[in-house]
């Protein structure tokens, strides 16, 4: 999520076939020094969430109000969800996904990497503009990331801005997209030292921690993640047409931080009852409610890509947060931008301006590597297929935001698929997790533990098994389409001479198909097909899963997941 409050994905894992006591992960020999975002900390100890083994993911609560003095806990009345199960429950028997954030070396090293400025002259000029607050706002249609429609004459307006906001900064020859990141000393003193304020630890990761202080989520992060999160928060706020002084946390069903301290690399946001992965109260009779939620989340993906020109690249049920009452979902947001990237055509034009030290910070360069994108358990079919041919294959968006959007929507379809399986299983959500998700997550974790640069063949094998399992699960809902999808992937590998992977894909698919029964979901699936919104849900989901090649990413998906 925006850096506001998710527990860093993958810090909690529960190995397959284990009793309730969770076993610590052993350091896998596939990890190498080239890993950018690591599964293991520097001391080689496994990362873990420091929360009860069976608890729901505890995510942030109420928004922090910046413009007023009423920042007390009484104004923040959202509470964290608790696990419904006792200590002796079988939660730990369910395989949970490891962290799969970016696996490549960081492209943004200020000392020697590509700078966004064509020469020191332009960098010095832009720094001078920022330092003097001579920032001009433009509505030019030629600049996609331009945000606001007026020229600032009153420079003191910057003293009133409390949350990151995007501006178009003009030099004599170039236009830069710069997010102004204000520094609030009062909030810094209140939240930036959570250990000293006895804040409760929600999660621990390789690059920081997530705390809860009076129901406010505090996320500490590393430099790059703080920069990209602050930048994305400013872009979303501005491109939505939000007021310049807005400090909203939720915009267009996207959860963003409403305060980022670039001095301490701390961001604040709000909490929700639970994440979608931990939601267990699915009821096929409420499909209209669920379809409406999915439509809002799909619109969030479209807004992020088509308006903001940003790929999420980490869509999973763990990064979708909801408020609910029993089986009814009232509110849902997409969060966590740790893996997000600007569309590559904007490389070299994006930065943040930090009020606290009046310096510029470059936004990390987008490399668009498929192995950098998504958790393998929710990676689109087309992305996993491309990795099998070339581990370091880059996504060709062709400067077309629709292609970027469809790639994110295909990952969203993987999330919806698991939701439908939980919704339709007559045995209940817990059994659906154990029966349909356990093997998928075990295979995905196998890929997560490998560095694709050091062990490309092992990584491709692991991704091949994940791809086969995706097709197996897809066949449970769309058995008339699964043969065509299977044959397209098989032929794709065969035509490119990847005969070993082709045979591994075939063997894994055939073996896992024998182990997967459709019977538990037949009744629920029939109920889904008999309702108007259930039929629409299955139609839209099927259309996204029929995107199996790079050319398919040009399809018009604007009518899918629309109420």
Swiss-Prot record:
ATP binds at residues 202-210, 219. Keywords: ATP-binding, Kinase, Nucleotide-binding, Transferase. The keyword Ribonucleoprotein does not apply. PROSITE patterns: PROTEIN_KINASE_TYR. It comes from the Viruses. Residues 1-33 are annotated as: Disordered. Coiled coil: none annotated. Phosphorylates the antiviral nucleoside analog ganciclovir. This is Probable ganciclovir kinase. It comes from Human herpesvirus 6B (strain Z29) (HHV-6 variant B). The gene is U69.
